């Protein structure tokens, strides 16, 4: 392993890709070319026996072998994928080949053409004399230590000339690695070989993170090729002017979930005898229909991680609620009470949730519906489904008439109307949705959520912060929504007709008020556990909803006892 016996050679792996002016009949939208070469056009053929490109299986003859330079493959497609490249050495002893998993990513239309260059440094320790001579002929650097730091070279931003990307080597990687704003990017890594057949990769694939963001999720359909692999590899031009036309589906460009990642930083140890960095077959990015699902999962995952981080830095717990007055008996104060509660809620919203400006009025279902559609389109995260599920689960107040008129009409309805509405309620017990303007009592809901969910889950009430993930077992970013409209089970109807008088309603209002001020996470966890035992709850992807009025008195008493303990602690 002495440095005096080490020879270092460099390989450049890269690809160029640009959007075609017109898609082909098969729907191909990009022309691309991938290559392996020596730096500054040094002749790596001296020590390279052949280069094998393992294209995706959807291509005809996916295994492309290039025995003579230029070692390149030109194709058309509309998909990015991980392309395993095997470089075989003219070496009688191990190592006889090295494998790289190359990320052949494509840019979307409107972005600059891709011109990516990846520099690989191969250090052979104690090579045989014959192989050493071959390495030196190919521009190998003798007497180099295996710990030589990797340097990176930058390719030129031109993508029309096949030799353009080797012309510049002085640009910094940091500027060239941002593939979203520049059409060229570069990276470097170092590989060392020794007699014990170990291969050490020190990967510094700087643009891989950025480039993955621009990968397109699509599938490479089959394409007939009458040329031999040798002919296609020798073809000098990189952009084929194919004239077939077909409009490619718009959904073809979805952000994918990267199936196979390039080697990560700092020394993945691999045995050269296998010659494989990764046994996986090249993973194809899924077609448009599946890519939506995968990209949604990816966004959910990243959003969940972001929410998890925000939980740890969020305040212990802040609860707000759009609780309208439950009592109807005292009609003279209802209007004032409503205005007061709404103003209090909006004050709480401003003081407790300063970052969120777009919380909708709880009575404005039109805004609410717009909001849910907006959040679905703009925020494809786990929170995005909560607005639609909440708005469908929470009875809307304005689907029949204007919000204030319908509410005031109900508030001033007589007791007979209330009783007849209760009878209707009995028929609607099994339904989770029903207009709130029945019986004059309007729904009150407590939504517990972390701050990042506020815009999309604001369906019909202001939001509040959720405690960290341990609060809810089902999901680490779920919303706990406590609803108490006058939807009641039949047993609760009997209670209402008999025992459940104004005093009980007062208790529920008080319970709601105390839930608003509750901040102890362990108490909230107890509440969730209790509601789970009753079975009277509804779980969507992002919410945990339950109805206070559907709970029996025993459960309500337990809730009150939890609040008592929180008050004394």
From Swiss-Prot:
Question: What are the annotated GO cellular component locations?
Answer: chromosome; cytosol; nucleus; transcription elongation factor complex
Identify the residues that the record assigns to the YEATS domain, covering every copy: 1-138
Q: List the disulfide bonds.
A: none
Expression across tissues is: Ubiquitously expressed. Strong expression in the spleen.
Q: Name one GO molecular function term.
A: lysine-acetylated histone binding
Q: Recite the UniProt keywords alphabetically.
A: Activator, Chromosome, DNA-binding, Isopeptide bond, Nucleus, Phosphoprotein, Transcription, Transcription regulation, Ubl conjugation
Q: So which residues are the signal peptide here?
A: none
What CDD domains does its record include?
YEATS_AF-9_like
List the PROSITE patterns.
YEATS
Q: Where is the composition biased (Basic and acidic residues)?
A: 202-265, 323-350
Pinpoint motif Nuclear localization signal by residue range: 296-301
Gene Ontology biological-process annotations: anterior/posterior pattern specification; gene expression; hematopoietic stem cell differentiation; negative regulation of canonical Wnt signaling pathway; positive regulation of DNA-templated transcription; positive regulation of Wnt signaling pathway, planar cell polarity pathway; regulation of chromatin organization; regulation of stem cell division
Question: In the UniProt record, does the keyword Ubl conjugation occur?
Answer: yes
Instruction: State where it is primarily located.
Output: nucleus
Residue stretches of biased makeup (Acidic residues): 358-369, 415-430
Q: Where is the composition biased (Low complexity)?
A: 149-190, 304-314, 372-396, 446-462
Region annotated Disordered, chain positions: 138-476
Alphabetized InterPro entries for the sequence: AF-9_AHD, YEAST_sf, YEATS_dom, YEATS_domain
Q: Does the keyword DNA-binding apply?
A: yes
Where does cross-link Glycyl lysine isopeptide (Lys-Gly) (interchain with G-Cter in SUMO2) occur? 340
Q: Where in the sequence is Phosphoserine found? A: 289, 295, 413, 420, 484
Any idea where this protein resides? Nucleus; Chromosome
Quote the function comment for this protein: Chromatin reader component of the super elongation complex (SEC), a complex required to increase the catalytic rate of RNA polymerase II transcription by suppressing transient pausing by the polymerase at multiple sites along the DNA. Specifically recognizes and binds acylated histone H3, with a preference for histone H3 that is crotonylated. Crotonylation marks active promoters and enhancers and confers resistance to transcriptional repressors. Recognizes and binds histone H3 crotonylated at 'Lys-9' (H3K9cr), and with slightly lower affinity histone H3 crotonylated at 'Lys-18' (H3K18cr).
Q: How does it assemble?
A: Component of the super elongation complex (SEC), at least composed of EAF1, EAF2, CDK9, MLLT3/AF9, AFF (AFF1 or AFF4), the P-TEFb complex and ELL (ELL, ELL2 or ELL3). Interacts with BCOR. Interacts with CBX8. Interacts with ALKBH4.
- Domain remark text: The YEATS domain specifically recognizes and binds acylated histones, with a marked preference for histones that are crotonylated. Also binds histone H3 acetylated at 'Lys-9' (H3K9ac), but with lower affinity. Binds crotonylated lysine through a non-canonical pi-pi-pi stacking mechanism. The YEATS domain also binds DNA.
- Name recorded for this polypeptide: Protein AF-9
Gene name? Mllt3
């Amino acid at each position: 392993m002495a440095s005096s016996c080490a020879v270092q050679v460099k390989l450049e792996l890269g690809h160029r890709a640009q959007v075609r002016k017109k898609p082909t009949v098969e729907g191909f939208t990009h022309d691309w070319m991938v290559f392996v070469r020596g730096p500054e056009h040094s002749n790596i053929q001296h020590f390279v026996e052949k280069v094998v490109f393992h294209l995706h299986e959807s291509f005809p003859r996916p295994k492309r072998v290039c025995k003579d330079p230029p070692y390149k493959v030109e194709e058309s497609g509309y998909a990015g994928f991980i392309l395993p490249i095997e470089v075989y050495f003219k070496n009688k002893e191990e190592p006889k080949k090295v494998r790289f998993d190359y990320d052949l990513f494509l840019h979307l239309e409107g972005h600059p053409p891709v011109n990516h260059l990846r520099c690989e440094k191969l250090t052979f320790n104690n090579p045989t004399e014959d192989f050493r001579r071959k390495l030196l002929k190919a521009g190998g650097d003798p007497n180099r230590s295996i710990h030589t730091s990797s340097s990176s070279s930058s390719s030129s931003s031109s993508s029309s000339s096949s030799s353009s990307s080797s012309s510049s080597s002085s640009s910094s990687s940091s500027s060239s690695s941002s593939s979203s704003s520049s059409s060229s990017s570069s990276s470097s890594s170092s590989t060392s070989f020794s007699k014990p057949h170990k291969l050490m990769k020190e990967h510094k694939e700087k643009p891989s993170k950025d480039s993955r963001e621009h990968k397109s999720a699509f599938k490479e359909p089959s394409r007939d090729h009458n040329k031999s692999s040798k002919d296609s590899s020798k073809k000098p031009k990189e952009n084929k002017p194919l004239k077939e036309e077909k409009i490619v589906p718009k959904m073809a460009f979805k952000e994918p979930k990267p199936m196979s990642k390039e080697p990560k930083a700092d020394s993945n140890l691999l045995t050269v005898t296998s010659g494989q960095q990764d046994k996986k077959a090249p993973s194809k990015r899924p077609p448009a229909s599946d890519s939506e699902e995968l990209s949604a999962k990816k966004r959910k995952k990243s959003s969940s991680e972001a929410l998890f981080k925000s939980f740890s830095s969020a305040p212990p717990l802040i609860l707000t609620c759009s609780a309208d007055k439950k009592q109807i008996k005292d009609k003279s104060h209802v209007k004032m009470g409503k205005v007061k509660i709404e103003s209090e809620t909006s004050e709480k919203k401003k003081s407790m949730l300063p970052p969120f400006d777009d919380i909708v009025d709880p009575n404005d279902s039109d805004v609410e519906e717009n909001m849910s559609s907006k959040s679905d389109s703009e925020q494809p995260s786990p929170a995005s489904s909560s607005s639609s599920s909440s708005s469908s689960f929470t009875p809307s107040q304005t689907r029949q008439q204007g919000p204030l008129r319908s509410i005031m009409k109900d508030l001033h309805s007589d007791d007979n109307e209330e009783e007849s509405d209760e009878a209707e309620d009995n028929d609607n017990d099994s339904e989770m949705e029903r207009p709130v303007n029945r019986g004059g009592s309007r729904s009150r809901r407590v939504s517990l959520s972390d701050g990042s969910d506020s815009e999309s889950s604001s369906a019909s009430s202001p939001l509040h912060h959720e405690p960290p993930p341990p609060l809810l077992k089902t999901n680490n970013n779920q919303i706990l929504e406590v609803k108490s409209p006058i939807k009641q089970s039949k047993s609760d109807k009997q209670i209402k007709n008999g025992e459940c008088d104004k005093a009980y309603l007062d208790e529920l209002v008080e319970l709601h008020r105390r839930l608003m001020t509750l901040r102890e996470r362990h108490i909230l966890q107890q509440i969730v556990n209790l509601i789970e035992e009753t079975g009277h709850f509804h779980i969507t992807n992002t919410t945990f909803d339950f109805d206070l009025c559907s709970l029996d008195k025993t459960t309500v008493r337990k809730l009150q006892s939890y609040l008592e303990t929180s008050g004394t602690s």
